[in-house]
Amino acid sequence: MEGGRGVTRVLLVDDSPVDRRVVQLLLSSSACAGSFHVIAVDSAKKAMEFLGLKEEGKEQAIDMVLTDYCMPEMTGYELLKAIKALSPLKPIPVIVMSSENEPQRISRCMNAGAEDFIVKPLQSKDVQRLRKCSPANTQCCDAGSDGKPPLLLLPSDHVVVDATAASPPPPPSRRRAHFAGVAMVLHSSSVELSHYFPFLFKFILLVYAILCLGELLHRWSNGCFLNLWCA
């Protein structure tokens, strides 16, 4: 089900506030031109409640689920299986994210029905992959449709490799991926703060002028100013 005027409603599921903020900033940026409407929750259980998968006959309110893999209580993989099992008539596209590029984890999710697997942090080049997995786009991956092992797009270098490849590339550092996400948030904040720099500079000059005037008045009252002028 596609939102009005071509807007894809995305349910973002991630227990990390930083990672949620990164995705929200990216999908709400001018580059996306209003293509996405993001609804964020911090757990898989809240996602289940929002989707109404526990209530028979309740209509879906979103077009796509973008979920983290590692979460407490209920993982993204378990959420993926629940969505695919409980909504067979109206399948919801599910994209899994993880800060670890592990081929076994990717293969596990793809075999469970995930439309894609993206390594964190989400980047602008990944937006097109989300568009391809939109219900209105028929180009989304159809894993195993030809009876062959699914081809996985490893998000670290965006090179298509076979899931059975023997020599996978080394996984990126989870800490490095987290820092990259923090850096994206800080960059966005710095852009917003840059508009206030001229006002801050004028305020500092005004304070400095007031301090100088106060010092002159203090010297005048003590007679120091006249002595300095006569000398």
From Swiss-Prot:
Two-component system major event consists of a His-to-Asp phosphorelay between a sensor histidine kinase (HK) and a response regulator (RR). In plants, the His-to-Asp phosphorelay involves an additional intermediate named Histidine-containing phosphotransfer protein (HPt). This multistep phosphorelay consists of a His-Asp-His-Asp sequential transfer of a phosphate group between first a His and an Asp of the HK protein, followed by the transfer to a conserved His of the HPt protein and finally the transfer to an Asp in the receiver domain of the RR protein. SUPFAM superfamilies: CheY-like. The modification 4-aspartylphosphate is found at D68. It holds the Pfam family Response_reg. It comes from the Eukaryota. Belongs to the ARR family. Type-A subfamily. Functions as a response regulator involved in His-to-Asp phosphorelay signal transduction system. Phosphorylation of the Asp residue in the receiver domain activates the ability of the protein to promote the transcription of target genes. Type-A response regulators seem to act as negative regulators of the cytokinin signaling. This is Two-component response regulator ORR1.
